[in-house]
Amino acid sequence: MKITITKNEKEFDCTAAWRIIGQMLNKPESVIGLSTGRTTGNLHRLVGEIYTQYPFKVDTVTFFGLDEVTNVPREYAGACYTMLKTELMDTLGIKEENFLMLPTISGDFEQSCRDFQQEIANRGGIDLLILGLGENGHLGFNQPESPFGGEAWVTRMNVELEERIRRETGTPPDKELGGATLGIKNIMQARRIVLVAKGTNKADIVKRMLEGPVTTDVPASILQLHPNCEFLLDEAAASMLNC
Protein backbone atom coordinates (compact mmCIF):
# COMPACT_ATOMS: atom_id res chain seq x y z
CA MET A 1 0.00 0.00 0.00
CA LYS A 2 1.54 3.29 -1.12
CA ILE A 3 0.47 6.63 0.35
CA THR A 4 1.57 9.85 -1.36
CA ILE A 5 0.86 13.15 0.41
CA THR A 6 1.12 16.40 -1.54
CA LYS A 7 1.59 19.85 -0.02
CA ASN A 8 -1.07 21.77 -1.93
CA GLU A 9 -3.74 21.53 -4.63
CA LYS A 10 -1.35 22.42 -7.46
CA GLU A 11 1.05 19.63 -6.52
CA PHE A 12 -1.89 17.26 -6.03
CA ASP A 13 -3.33 17.91 -9.50
CA CYS A 14 0.09 17.82 -11.16
CA THR A 15 1.05 14.52 -9.51
CA ALA A 16 -2.24 12.90 -10.50
CA ALA A 17 -2.07 14.25 -14.05
CA TRP A 18 1.37 12.78 -14.54
CA ARG A 19 0.19 9.40 -13.33
CA ILE A 20 -2.19 9.40 -16.32
CA ILE A 21 0.33 10.85 -18.76
CA GLY A 22 3.04 8.46 -17.64
CA GLN A 23 0.74 5.50 -18.25
CA MET A 24 0.02 6.69 -21.80
CA LEU A 25 3.70 7.28 -22.54
CA ASN A 26 4.79 3.92 -21.14
CA LYS A 27 2.02 1.97 -22.89
CA PRO A 28 0.34 3.77 -25.82
CA GLU A 29 -2.33 1.02 -25.98
CA SER A 30 -3.37 1.54 -22.36
CA VAL A 31 -6.90 1.13 -21.06
CA ILE A 32 -7.45 3.92 -18.54
CA GLY A 33 -10.48 4.43 -16.31
CA LEU A 34 -11.45 7.88 -15.05
CA SER A 35 -13.82 9.17 -12.39
CA THR A 36 -15.76 12.42 -12.40
CA GLY A 37 -16.33 14.87 -9.58
CA ARG A 38 -14.89 17.89 -7.81
CA THR A 39 -11.62 16.10 -7.07
CA THR A 40 -10.77 15.05 -10.62
CA GLY A 41 -11.98 17.86 -12.88
CA ASN A 42 -8.88 20.04 -12.58
CA LEU A 43 -6.44 17.16 -12.98
CA HIS A 44 -8.22 16.06 -16.17
CA ARG A 45 -7.94 19.58 -17.56
CA LEU A 46 -4.26 19.67 -16.61
CA VAL A 47 -3.61 16.49 -18.60
CA GLY A 48 -5.18 18.27 -21.58
CA GLU A 49 -3.10 21.40 -21.05
CA ILE A 50 0.15 19.42 -20.93
CA TYR A 51 -0.86 17.47 -24.03
CA THR A 52 -1.63 20.70 -25.90
CA GLN A 53 1.83 22.09 -25.10
CA TYR A 54 3.74 18.85 -25.62
CA PRO A 55 1.70 16.52 -27.86
CA PHE A 56 2.24 12.77 -27.59
CA LYS A 57 0.57 9.65 -29.00
CA VAL A 58 -2.99 9.15 -27.70
CA ASP A 59 -4.87 7.64 -30.64
CA THR A 60 -4.38 4.06 -29.41
CA VAL A 61 -5.37 4.75 -25.79
CA THR A 62 -8.80 3.58 -24.61
CA PHE A 63 -10.49 5.69 -21.94
CA PHE A 64 -13.60 4.72 -20.04
CA GLY A 65 -15.73 6.26 -17.32
CA LEU A 66 -16.19 4.39 -14.07
CA ASP A 67 -19.89 5.19 -13.79
CA GLU A 68 -22.85 7.07 -15.24
CA VAL A 69 -26.16 8.60 -14.23
CA THR A 70 -29.11 6.71 -15.74
CA ASN A 71 -32.32 7.97 -17.31
CA VAL A 72 -31.02 11.46 -18.08
CA PRO A 73 -30.01 12.90 -21.47
CA ARG A 74 -26.42 12.05 -22.37
CA GLU A 75 -25.88 15.75 -23.07
CA TYR A 76 -26.89 16.73 -19.52
CA ALA A 77 -24.03 18.74 -17.99
CA GLY A 78 -23.95 16.43 -14.95
CA ALA A 79 -23.73 13.23 -17.01
CA CYS A 80 -20.33 11.60 -16.61
CA TYR A 81 -20.03 11.28 -20.39
CA THR A 82 -20.42 15.03 -20.87
CA MET A 83 -18.07 15.87 -18.01
CA LEU A 84 -15.26 13.63 -19.24
CA LYS A 85 -15.75 14.73 -22.84
CA THR A 86 -15.53 18.38 -21.86
CA GLU A 87 -12.71 18.01 -19.32
CA LEU A 88 -10.38 15.83 -21.39
CA MET A 89 -11.61 13.78 -24.36
CA ASP A 90 -12.23 16.74 -26.67
CA THR A 91 -8.81 18.22 -25.88
CA LEU A 92 -7.04 14.94 -26.60
CA GLY A 93 -9.14 14.33 -29.70
CA ILE A 94 -10.17 10.87 -28.51
CA LYS A 95 -12.50 9.13 -30.96
CA GLU A 96 -15.84 7.83 -29.71
CA GLU A 97 -14.79 4.21 -30.30
CA ASN A 98 -11.94 4.72 -27.83
CA PHE A 99 -14.11 6.45 -25.22
CA LEU A 100 -16.23 3.83 -23.49
CA MET A 101 -19.13 4.82 -21.26
CA LEU A 102 -22.07 3.13 -19.65
CA PRO A 103 -25.27 4.42 -21.29
CA THR A 104 -27.50 7.05 -19.74
CA ILE A 105 -30.51 5.51 -21.51
CA SER A 106 -31.00 1.79 -22.15
CA GLY A 107 -33.83 -0.64 -22.74
CA ASP A 108 -31.89 -3.25 -20.76
CA PHE A 109 -29.39 -1.83 -18.29
CA GLU A 110 -28.34 -5.27 -17.03
CA GLN A 111 -27.24 -6.24 -20.53
CA SER A 112 -25.63 -2.84 -21.08
CA CYS A 113 -23.56 -3.34 -17.93
CA ARG A 114 -22.46 -6.79 -19.06
CA ASP A 115 -21.54 -5.44 -22.49
CA PHE A 116 -19.55 -2.58 -20.95
CA GLN A 117 -17.37 -4.74 -18.74
CA GLN A 118 -16.90 -7.24 -21.57
CA GLU A 119 -15.69 -4.50 -23.93
CA ILE A 120 -13.12 -3.43 -21.35
CA ALA A 121 -12.00 -7.06 -21.04
CA ASN A 122 -11.82 -7.39 -24.82
CA ARG A 123 -9.35 -4.51 -24.90
CA GLY A 124 -7.07 -6.22 -22.42
CA GLY A 125 -8.48 -5.11 -19.09
CA ILE A 126 -7.80 -2.04 -17.00
CA ASP A 127 -4.19 -0.81 -16.93
CA LEU A 128 -4.82 2.25 -14.76
CA LEU A 129 -7.92 3.28 -12.83
CA ILE A 130 -8.20 6.72 -11.25
CA LEU A 131 -10.70 6.63 -8.39
CA GLY A 132 -12.33 9.40 -6.42
CA LEU A 133 -13.49 8.86 -2.86
CA GLY A 134 -16.98 9.63 -1.62
CA GLU A 135 -17.43 11.12 1.84
CA ASN A 136 -19.11 7.87 2.92
CA GLY A 137 -16.40 5.76 1.29
CA HIS A 138 -18.24 4.98 -1.93
CA LEU A 139 -16.40 4.08 -5.15
CA GLY A 140 -18.31 5.06 -8.26
CA PHE A 141 -21.93 4.36 -7.39
CA ASN A 142 -20.97 1.49 -5.09
CA GLN A 143 -22.45 2.84 -1.87
CA PRO A 144 -21.90 1.33 1.61
CA GLU A 145 -23.13 -2.27 1.84
CA SER A 146 -22.42 -2.89 -1.86
CA PRO A 147 -21.04 -6.42 -2.29
CA PHE A 148 -17.30 -6.76 -2.71
CA GLY A 149 -17.91 -9.46 -5.32
CA GLY A 150 -20.23 -7.32 -7.43
CA GLU A 151 -19.72 -6.64 -11.12
CA ALA A 152 -21.12 -3.80 -13.25
CA TRP A 153 -24.66 -2.94 -12.17
CA VAL A 154 -27.23 -0.20 -11.67
CA THR A 155 -27.83 0.97 -8.13
CA ARG A 156 -29.73 3.77 -6.44
CA MET A 157 -27.86 7.02 -5.92
CA ASN A 158 -27.95 8.97 -2.68
CA VAL A 159 -30.96 11.18 -2.03
CA GLU A 160 -29.13 14.51 -2.23
CA LEU A 161 -27.62 13.76 -5.63
CA GLU A 162 -30.90 12.43 -6.98
CA GLU A 163 -32.77 15.55 -5.89
CA ARG A 164 -30.20 17.83 -7.52
CA ILE A 165 -30.29 15.94 -10.80
CA ARG A 166 -34.09 16.01 -10.86
CA ARG A 167 -34.03 19.78 -10.40
CA GLU A 168 -31.40 20.32 -13.09
CA THR A 169 -32.98 18.01 -15.67
CA GLY A 170 -36.66 18.41 -14.85
CA THR A 171 -36.95 14.64 -14.38
CA PRO A 172 -40.39 13.83 -12.90
CA PRO A 173 -40.66 11.90 -9.61
CA ASP A 174 -42.17 8.85 -11.32
CA LYS A 175 -39.06 8.38 -13.49
CA GLU A 176 -36.43 6.41 -11.60
CA LEU A 177 -32.87 7.72 -11.57
CA GLY A 178 -29.96 5.44 -10.82
CA GLY A 179 -26.24 5.04 -11.08
CA ALA A 180 -24.66 2.56 -13.48
CA THR A 181 -21.20 1.62 -12.29
CA LEU A 182 -18.45 -0.92 -12.49
CA GLY A 183 -18.69 -3.17 -9.45
CA ILE A 184 -16.06 -3.53 -6.78
CA LYS A 185 -14.91 -6.84 -8.26
CA ASN A 186 -14.24 -5.05 -11.57
CA ILE A 187 -12.38 -2.27 -9.74
CA MET A 188 -10.15 -4.74 -7.93
CA GLN A 189 -9.23 -6.38 -11.25
CA ALA A 190 -7.44 -3.21 -12.40
CA ARG A 191 -3.71 -3.76 -12.70
CA ARG A 192 -2.99 -0.38 -11.13
CA ILE A 193 -5.18 1.99 -9.11
CA VAL A 194 -4.60 5.57 -8.00
CA LEU A 195 -7.21 6.79 -5.52
CA VAL A 196 -7.28 10.57 -5.21
CA ALA A 197 -8.73 12.52 -2.27
CA LYS A 198 -8.26 16.09 -1.11
CA GLY A 199 -9.74 18.49 1.44
CA THR A 200 -10.57 18.38 5.13
CA ASN A 201 -14.03 16.98 4.34
CA LYS A 202 -12.32 13.76 3.26
CA ALA A 203 -10.02 13.41 6.29
CA ASP A 204 -12.34 11.21 8.36
CA ILE A 205 -13.20 8.80 5.57
CA VAL A 206 -9.54 8.61 4.48
CA LYS A 207 -8.65 7.49 8.01
CA ARG A 208 -11.45 4.92 8.04
CA MET A 209 -10.45 3.68 4.58
CA LEU A 210 -6.76 3.23 5.40
CA GLU A 211 -6.65 2.52 9.12
CA GLY A 212 -10.00 0.87 9.76
CA PRO A 213 -11.12 -2.69 9.01
CA VAL A 214 -11.94 -3.88 5.51
CA THR A 215 -15.72 -3.69 5.50
CA THR A 216 -18.60 -3.07 3.13
CA ASP A 217 -19.54 -0.20 5.47
CA VAL A 218 -16.62 1.61 3.81
CA PRO A 219 -16.40 0.27 0.25
CA ALA A 220 -13.03 1.94 -0.40
CA SER A 221 -11.47 -0.03 2.47
CA ILE A 222 -11.21 -3.01 0.11
CA LEU A 223 -8.37 -1.16 -1.62
CA GLN A 224 -6.15 -2.05 1.34
CA LEU A 225 -6.02 -5.51 -0.26
CA HIS A 226 -5.13 -4.38 -3.79
CA PRO A 227 -1.53 -5.28 -4.74
CA ASN A 228 -0.84 -2.06 -6.67
CA CYS A 229 -2.89 0.81 -5.27
CA GLU A 230 -1.56 4.29 -4.56
CA PHE A 231 -3.49 6.63 -2.28
CA LEU A 232 -2.78 10.18 -3.49
CA LEU A 233 -3.81 12.71 -0.85
CA ASP A 234 -3.29 16.35 -0.01
CA GLU A 235 -2.23 17.31 3.51
CA ALA A 236 -5.79 18.17 4.51
CA ALA A 237 -7.19 14.79 3.49
CA ALA A 238 -4.30 13.04 5.25
CA SER A 239 -4.52 15.14 8.42
CA MET A 240 -6.16 12.45 10.60
CA LEU A 241 -3.83 9.59 9.64
CA ASN A 242 -1.46 8.20 12.24
CA CYS A 243 1.32 7.62 9.72
Question: Where does each model-flagged region fall?
Answer:
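Class I SAM-dependent methyltransferase SAM-binding "motif I" and its flanking Rossmann-like core
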Residues: 136, 140-184
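Glycine-rich N-terminal segment of FAD-binding domains in flavoprotein oxidoreductases
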Residues: 26-52
